[in-house]
Swiss-Prot record:
It comes from Rattus norvegicus. PANTHER family: IRON-SULFUR CLUSTER ASSEMBLY 1 HOMOLOG, MITOCHONDRIAL (PTHR10072:SF41), IRON-SULFUR CLUSTER ASSEMBLY PROTEIN (PTHR10072). GO terms for biological process: endocrine process; iron-sulfur cluster assembly. Residues 1-12 form a transit peptide. Interacts with CRY2, but not with CRY1 (in vitro). Its main location: mitochondrion. Keywords: Iron, Iron-sulfur, Metal-binding, Mitochondrion, Transit peptide. The lineage of its organism: Eukaryota, Metazoa, Chordata, Craniata, Vertebrata. Pfam families: Fe-S_biosyn. It comes from the Eukaryota. This is Iron-sulfur cluster assembly 1 homolog, mitochondrial.
């Protein structure tokens, strides 16, 4: 059983140099710290699960949920002591993506800096590849 998490937006990244890595997703130090903080309050969960859903004005949207187990088809990313599981349906859309956590005076959210995105909606919540 999964529990819903926080809001996430996506940004199309142009001219981004891909870093050689075996992981489909890399995490910034800010994202790692926030995930550790979130999981500290949820000891029954082992990590976060990233999925992709069909919704929004541009077609696709990422979802983030707490998870207690790794699904059979999930790809596991372990970085700096945190575990992020990527649902099979989301794996190709996330290749080369950097997951960040951004805070400003009015909001805080996870942001997916994704070089595969062709377009996003005005609010940044949905995208197409």
């Amino acid at each position: 059983m999964s529990a819903s998490l926080v809001r996430a937006t996506v940004r199309a990244v142009s001219k981004r140099k891909l870093q050689p890595t075996r992981a489909a997703l890399t995490l910034t130090p800010s994202a790692v710290n926030k995930i550790k903080q979130l999981l500290k309050d949820k000891p029954e969960h082992v990590g976060l699960k990233v999925g992709v859903r069909t919704r929004g004005c541009n077609g696709l949207s990422y979802s983030l949920e707490y998870t207690k187990t790794k699904g059979d088809a999930d790809e596991e990313v372990i970085q700096d002591g945190v575990r992020v599981f990527i649902e099979k349906k989301a794996q190709l859309t996330l290749l080369g993506t950097e997951m960040d956590y951004v805070e400003d005076k009015l909001s805080s959210e996870f942001v997916f800096n994704n070089p595969n995105i062709k377009g996003t909606c005005g609010c940044g919540e949905s995208f197409n590849v």
